[in-house]
Amino acid sequence: MQGFINLNKQFGWTSHDCVARLRKMLRLKRVGHAGTLDPAATGVLPIAVGKATRLLQYLPSDKAYKATVRFGVQTTTDDLQGEIITSQPCRGLSLSEVKTALPQFIGKIEQIPPIYSAIQVEGKRLYDLARKGEIIEVPARTVEVFSIDVLDWREGDFPELDVAIACGSGTYIRAIARDLGAVFHTGGTLAALIRTHSSGFNLTDSLTLTDLETQLQAGTFEPTPADAALQCLPSVTLPSISAQKWCQGQRIELNLETIGKVRVYQAETNIFLGIGELQAGVLIPQMVFEPIS
């Protein structure tokens, strides 16, 4: 078996938990995931199985979330799973005020990741250092947020904001919740998070582990074809002789102006051969997925 699974991760599971479970269910060792999802988050977790694990690096990096920000609360983890640092009612905060602050979180921004995160500093993961009580300065990183759209606003002592966020890889929604609360000096934390899109996969087409197990038992499960997850890349077809040479590591001259990574197919069979890179009209092998003899 090889290809991708659009998994709907359940609450409380780590991304590694899902991979470990799938290895047992599929009886495969080669299982990997794209884009770590926090245990408290649910939603799309792209899974690669078999040789498709080699294609994870080529998946598009865009992501989308539905997030709930709770104002008046600040926690150690920047979500409700951590210890409460401060809790102060802020009933006077209005949606109109919050809306005026949202534009500063859109575009390329400097973001300090949560101290409880998988990012490595000096070779050590931040969450390991945080659990040991070690205080370390976390450097800011440049991330990109494409849009933030308000979905709902609930008033109260601890008002909540529902937003839809589209962003690039490496963006921490927990950090946005924290920093948005800091703007109003109320504190803010992430109360809920659903990933609705990741690396070309959508929540509407996803499978839970229970769904997958049911399909496996019925013998109806088919993974998403490896190349179907890479439709963001343009494609190139090669005749048999050129395809064979390319699969053997040779560069192929093509009269094409396209520059960058492409999907490569054999013209006669439409078999997906792998990923190449076009530079100055030359197709260079990057990853041969299906060699031909």
Swiss-Prot record:
The superkingdom of the source organism is Bacteria
Q: Please list the GO biological process terms of this entry.
A: mRNA pseudouridine synthesis; tRNA pseudouridine synthesis
The active site is formed by D38
Query: Could you confirm whether the keyword Transport appears in this record?
Result: no
Q: Which Gene3D superfamilies match?
A: Pseudouridine synthase (3.30.2350.10), PUA domain (2.30.130.10)
Note the HAMAP family from the entry. Answer: TruB_bact
Give the family this protein belongs to, as stated in its UniProt record: Belongs to the pseudouridine synthase TruB family. Type 1 subfamily.
Protein name per UniProt: tRNA pseudouridine synthase B
Gene source species: Nostoc sp. (strain PCC 7120 / SAG 25.82 / UTEX 2576)
Lineage, highest ranks first: Bacteria, Bacillati, Cyanobacteriota, Cyanophyceae, Nostocales
- Which gene is this protein's source? truB
